[in-house]
Amino acid sequence: MKTYLLFFFLLIGSGVLNFLSAQQITRYQVIKSFPIASSGGWDYIAVGPQNNRLYVSHGTQVNVLDETTGDSVGVIPNTTGVHGIAFVPSLGKGYTSNGRINTVSVFDLKTNQVLGQIAAGQNPDAIMYDEFSKLIITCNGRSSDLSLIDPVTEKVVATIPVGGKPETAVSDGMGKLYVNIEDKSEIAEVDINSRSVTNRWTLSPSEGPTGLAMDVKTRRLFAGCDKTLVIMDANNGKIIDRVTIGDGCDGVAFDPELKYVFASCGEGKLSIVHEENADKFVLAADVPTKRSARTIAEDPRTHTAFLPAAEFEKTAAPGERRPPMVPGTFQVLVVGQ
């Protein structure tokens, strides 16, 4: 018995158990898929607030699915060029960023009925709700700024220039926003009270930051760049680590209980990185998904991830940059253990 105990404690001291926790316990795989019959492109997907709903941006509408069965439970229409979805549960409202018409749609979380439209900046992309400031924030790609919207009055209360194309924003819950500036390969720190950029931190030599998530306890930022997940200290912009991931990452999610960082990569891979501690990160798994599955939402209650994807033709039509999507192939992949 003493020999076995000694070996066990040696394992702990050598860090082998941490390695096993990342490499063996992570058994994520695609467990099912939810087909969506309608046509059109897509961007972000969101898990609803305690209502067992998935909200899938899809061309000119948002498809609302039952998170467990994948059954359609509604459609939010007239969201042309929709990118993202955010929620304010206390008001019973949801919000979509409509990139092609420069608006934010307001909808009822119970009925999915559109309640109104709010003018935003140019090409609003990612959208989020900041619990600290009680504001909706949109990242406006073409006007290179953030729109801050009061969800009670449904008015834009401030616009913050960020000096580049803002792709995604996260909040530390204490008055700071962190924004991926895609065309500058940097993260901008924004003070929500002063309505200004207070720091700019380079991600170089990593390029093209898109997805962004944060561990608010360890104050680590996770930026999905070209084939690299960059881990940054949110206190000072110091690069903590760079972990190789798949190609074409456009979404990052973080599970605060399991300490997993999920990076969805369009090449057909979900890279999962384990946060051993604030300064140590290891690649736990590269889960095969489907080519085009580049964005992600993760439900921290069930530890399940959801990735929209579709099949595409092999060649592009004359004058087009990309091959067309094969009709009837749009779906949401469900990844779990």
Residue ranges and their predicted role:
Residues 1-5:
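Positively charged n-region of N-terminal signal peptides that target proteins for export
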Residues 6-7, 16:
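Cleavable N-terminal export/targeting peptides
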Residues 10-11, 18-337:
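Predominantly soluble domains enriched in secretory-pathway, periplasmic, or organellar proteins
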